[in-house]
Amino acid sequence: SVDAAKYMLAAGRILRGDFDSEKDLLVKSDPDSAGPIVFADFEDGTYGKWLSTGTAFGKGPVTLETKAEYQKDVRPHGKFFVNSHNVRLSGKTPSSGSADDQLGSLTSPRFRIERDFITFLVGGGAYKKETCVNLLVDGKVVLSATGRSNNTMTETGWDVRRWRGSEARIQVVDKRKGGWGNIGLDHIV
């Protein structure tokens, strides 16, 4: 079972944006728990079995070298990360506005929720339902997170105990054109 004090501490850290999955996620859901599961980190340089629609996410994850220079320090975990601020379309670096005008979604394959928490890095626009990361259960959005109108990805997390054992998908959404019309994601645990 989850220690109430540890849970409250982790919840406060999520709200402050300083949740650390390497440390905080090690709160086991039961004595037989094997610890965190890295669901996706994109370190093979592809989206794998994720379904990409539209033009926002390009053909694969970006690196610090291939993202727009003006996005500054996005703080990914590892080399590759998801970023819908698509400057890859023509081989040129378009203006910030045109890169933010690309729309699309990226949806994971189905998976079974096996732990009490899901954490990830997220950055980009702070527009609910428009630039967000969603947890889908039975095809419906049950939890959602946005960036903070900042390209620097911060760790956030969801308490998913309610859906433990359920099949789910993670969906990254970019439905917004213009300033902060982008979303970044990395290291889903």
PLM region descriptions:
Residues 66-100:
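Short carbohydrate-recognition loop motifs
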Residues 135-183:
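Extracellular carbohydrate recognition and processing domains
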Residues 16, 41-44, 84, 110, ...:
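Extracellular/lumenal ectodomain signal focusing on beta-strand-rich modules
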Residues 86-117, 127-130, 153-157:
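Short beta-strands within extracellular/lumenal beta-sheet-rich domains
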Residues 114, 121-132, 177-180:
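Extended, low-complexity, turn-rich repeat/linker tracts enriched in Gly/Pro/Ser/Thr and Asp/Glu
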Residues 1-65:
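Extracellular carbohydrate-recognition regions
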Residues 42, 117-124, 168-174:
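Extracellular beta-strand-rich recognition modules
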Residues 32-33, 38-41, 176-189:
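Extracellular polysaccharide-targeting segments
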